[in-house]
Amino acid sequence: MASSLNELNLVQVLEQASNPQHIRSDVQKLAEQQLRQWETQAGFHYLLQSIYLNLSNSLQIRWLAVIQFKNGVDKYWRSTRINAIPKDEKASIRGRLFEMIDEQNNQLCIQNAQASARIARLDFPVEWPTLFEDLENLLNDEIIRKDSVKIYNILMHINQIVKVLGTARIGRCRPAMQSKVPLILPLIVRIYLQSFEEWTTSSNLNYEDLSSLQVSYLALKVLRRIICEGYDRPQTDQSVCDFIKLSVSHFEMLISNHENFKKFDIYEKFIKCLGKLYFNLVTGSPANFILLPCSTQILITYTRLIFDKAPKVYRENSDVTGDFWEQTAIRGLLILKRVINFIHKKGAITLKARSDKLTIDASINKINTEFLNENLITRLVDTLMEWYLRLRPTELENWFMDPEEWINEQMATSYEYQIRPCAENVFQDLMNTFSELLVPYLLKKIENDASKLSNSLDDFLRKDAIYASFQLSASAVSEMVDFDRLLIQVFLPEATNTNISGDELRIIRRRVALIINEWSTVKCSEESKSLCYKLFTNFLTDEDDKVVLLTTVQTVRTMVDDWNFNKDTFQPFLTENVHLLLRKILPSVSLTETRLYVLNTLSDIIIQTKPLISRDLLVEILQIIPNLWEIATNNASEAILANALLRLLRNLVSSLGSQSHLTWDIAIPVVALACDPSSMQYQLLSEDGYELWGMLLQNFSSHDQEFDDKFVELVPFLKYGIETHTEILPTLLEIIKSYALILNPVDFFSNNTFQDIFKQMSKYLLKLREDSFQLVLEIWEILILSNESDYENLLLQKFYETGVLSALFDAIFLEEAPSSYLCSQIIQIIARISYVNPDALMTFLATYHDNLPTSNENARMPESIRKIVSKDQTYDSVVNKLLTGWIVCFRDIFDPKFKKVHILGISSLLRTGLVPILTEFSSIASLWIEMLEEINETNRGDCEKYHLNDIVTEQSIAFHPLTAEQLRYHQLCKNNDPVHNISLKDFISQSMEYLESHLGVERYQEFLKTINPSLLENLQMFLSIQPQEARP
C-alpha cells in the first residue's frame, strides 16, 4: 500500500479501490482506508482532478476520481471546514474545471459539471468573479463552436451552474448571476438557432447523426433556466423577448410537423421544454409573463391546440399511442389556469415595489383586451364540456377491467397529471372567475344540450359531461339553482332508472354521487340529505360495481365530515351503512389504498355520530382489527394501514366510553408495539399509538372494570418519548396526567419513570411551550389534591427529590422574572403545598436558601438564570421576597376560585409563626377582606363563582357526553379541593385563633395593636355576615 501522496500512488490506490476483482476484499478495504487518510491532505483534490482529466487512465479509475473529487468539494471546499482545501489549490482547480469539454463519456462530464456548479455556488462572485466571463470566452471560441462534443459539454456545465445558482435565495450569488447572464444569453441563443436550423431543415438527418438535435435541446434547456432564474423582469430585456417570440414560432412549427418529427425520441422533450419555459414564467410572475410582447401569441397557440387537438386527446391511449397530446394539452390548460387565477384575484400578490402595482394593472388590462374576450371564454367552456370533461374510451376500459384500481387513481390523481381532472379544475376556475358571463350561459346550455341527446353511448357520455359541469359549478351557480328540486325531479330518478343498460346505470350513479358530493356542502337541505342517505344505502346494498360503491363511500364521508353535519338526519341509516361498510365493502376490496379509505371512513362515522352507534356494533367493528393489524405489521406494502387502524381503535375507545375496557385485549398489545422504542414500527406508529394510549386512560371507568396492571407495564415507554418527541410532548403529558388521576400517590411515586420525567420537566420548566407548561402544573396540582394525610410526607419528599420544589422557587426568584400570569400559576402550586404543610414548605425554603450561590457567584451567572436572592441574604429576607412577589402576582388573578387557592396558601404560612410572615399580616388580611367582599360562600365553603369554568355541569352533561377522566377530575376537585370544602371565614377565624394560641394572649393583643384598626373592623364585619344556603 502506498503511503506518500503523489499522482502515481493515487492512481494505484484508485485502481485497487475500483477494480471489480477486489470487491469487498482486504485490498479494496485498505485502498478505501488510504483514500480517507489522504483526503484531508493538501493537494489531494488537485491530483484527483489531474487523474480524471487524464484520458490515458482507465474509465473506472477516472470515474472513481471524479466521484471522490465531487464529494471532497462538498466536505472541504468551504474555508471554514476542518481540513479545508487550501486557497491556492482551489485556485488551481478552478483554472482547470472547463478542460474536460472534449470528454466523450457523458456520465463523467455530468459529474464534473455538478462539481463545477457546487464550486460556483461557494465561490461566485467573491473568489470566482470571472465565472461568466470565462464561459463567455469559451462560447466565443470558433474552434469550440464547430465541435459538437465540446459545445455540448460546455452547455452541460452552464446548465448545472445556472441551476445551482438559481436556487440560492440568500447571499450575493443569485443577484450577481442575474447581472452576468446577459453576457452568455445571446451566445447560447446563437448556438440554439444554428443547431435547431440544422436538424429541422436537413433532409438527410438520421438516427446515427443526432448531434445537432442533442445540442439544440440542451441549449434550449439552458435558455429556459437562464430566462426563468436569471431575469426578475424578463419583459424588460429585448434579447429575452426576442428569443421567446422566436421560441413560439418554433413551438408552432414543431407542433404542426408532429408527424415528421415524432420519430425522434427527443422531439417530445422539445415540446415539454418550451411548455415548461412558458409555465415557469407564468408561475413565477403572471404579470411579467403577460407583459411579454408575445404572451398573447403563447396563449393563443395553446388555446388553439386545446381546441384543435381535443378529438386526438380524447381518443389517445397512453399504452398504445402514447400520451403526447394529453400532456401538451395539460400544459396549456395549466398556463391558462395561472392566467385565469391571476385575473380572478385581480393581481392580489405581495408587492415588492411601488412599480409592481403599475405592472399588475397593465398586465390585467392587456390580457382582458388582447385575449380574454367573451367569445373565447364561452368557446373554452364548450370545448371542455364536449371533449375534456367526458369520460374517455381508455378510462371506460380501465374502469371495466380493474374498477378498484381505477377509482383509486381518480381519488388520488393530481390535476396536474391527467387531462380530465385538469380540465375539471380549469372549468371550476372559469366558472368562479367569469360567473356573471358563464352562469346563465351554462344553465341555458345544460338545458338545451341535454334535451337534444340521443340514446347512443356517445351521447350518454356527453350527458355525463353535462352533469359533470353542473357538479363542478356548484359554488358559482348555487344562488340561481334549486338543488333540492333538481335532486328529486332529475338526479334521483336518473340514479334509480333501471330501464337503461347496466353500463350506463353505473356511469350515471357514479355521477349522481359526485354531484351530491359537491352540492351537499354548498346548498342542500336536511330533507334532501336524508334522501341522499337513503339513496346511498340502496347503492351500497344493491350495487356491485366497485367504482359506484367507492364513490358512494367517498360522498358519505364528505357529508359526514361536513361542518354542518347533523347526525340525527343520518341516524336512521347509520347502522345499515356501518354494516355494509364492515360486511360488504371492506371484505371485497383488495388494494391497500382502498382499505385505508374505508377504514378512515369508518373512523369518521364513529366519531361524528358518537354516541349513536350501539355497543354491539362497535364491538363488531373492533373484531376486524386483529387480522388487519397482523397484515399491516408484517407486510411492508400494507404498513400504512397500521396508522388507520390505530385511529379507528382510538375512535372506538372514545365512542365506547366507560365500556372501552372491551377493547383492552386488542388495544393494549397494539399500544405496546406502537410505543415501544425498540419496535421496528416505532417511528411510523408511535404518535398515533400515544394518542390511543391516552384515549384508553381517559375513558377508563373504575365503576365498570378494575385497572389493568398492563397499563403500568407500558409506563417505561413514556421516558423515551418525553426525551425525543418534544413536538408531541402535550400528548405524553396528558398520559401522565391520566395516571396521576387513576393511581394512588404511593403507586404513582413508586414508579421510577414518573420520577425521572419529573426531574426532566423540573429542569426545563420555563423553557416548555405554554401547553406543556400548563399540563406539568396540572399534574403536580392533581397529585397534591390526591394527597391523603398518610401520603403527605411522601408527596413532599418526592417533590424534593425530583427537583419540583427547587424548580418552583427558581422560577419565582429569577431576576428576569416570567410574566405575573406565569408567576401566579407557579405560585399556585406553592400555595397548594403550603396549605397541605406550611412548615415543611418553609423548611425546604431554608434548605433552598442554604444551597443558593453567593451574591458574587450569582453576579457571574448568565442573566437567564441569575436570581434576586443569594446565600448572603438572611433567610427572613428570602421569605420576605417570596411574600412580596406572591402579593404582587395576586393582583393579576381574577378567577375567584384561584384567588381562594392563593389565599388559603399564603394564609397557611401564618401557622409557621415566622416573623417575616407575621410582619405581612396586614397585607394578608387585606386579601381576606377583598375576597370576602367579592364572594358569599355556603357553610361548606363553596360558592357559585368557584364553578364559572367547570367542565362538568348539568348543561355540559346533557349536551356533551363527558369522559370518565373528566368526571374523575371533577370528583377529585369536589371531594378534595379545599376551595370547595373549606369555609374561608372559618379558615380565617381558625388562623386568628392559631395566632392567639401561638403568641399567647398578651403578645397576641400587642400584635393586634400594630394592625390598622379599620382593617380589623372591616375583617370583623365580613366574618359576621351569615353564609348563603348550601347548594343541594
Swiss-Prot record:
Cellular localization per UniProt: Cytoplasm; Nucleus
Modified residue annotations for N-acetylalanine: A2
Segments forming domain Importin N-terminal: 31-103
Major site of localization recorded for this protein: cytoplasm
SMART domains (alphabetical): IBN_N
UniProtKB keywords: Acetylation, Cytoplasm, Nucleus, Protein transport, Transport
Role of this protein: Functions in nuclear protein import as nuclear transport receptor. Serves as receptor for nuclear localization signals (NLS) in cargo substrates. Thought to mediate docking of the importin/substrate complex to the nuclear pore complex (NPC) through binding to nucleoporin and the complex is subsequently translocated through the pore by an energy requiring, RAN-dependent mechanism. Required for nuclear import of Ho endonuclease and RFP1, and involved in rRNA-processing and assembly or export of 60S ribosomal subunits.
Protein name: Importin beta-like protein KAP120
Natural source organism: Saccharomyces cerevisiae (strain ATCC 204508 / S288c) (Baker's yeast)
Gene behind this protein: KAP120
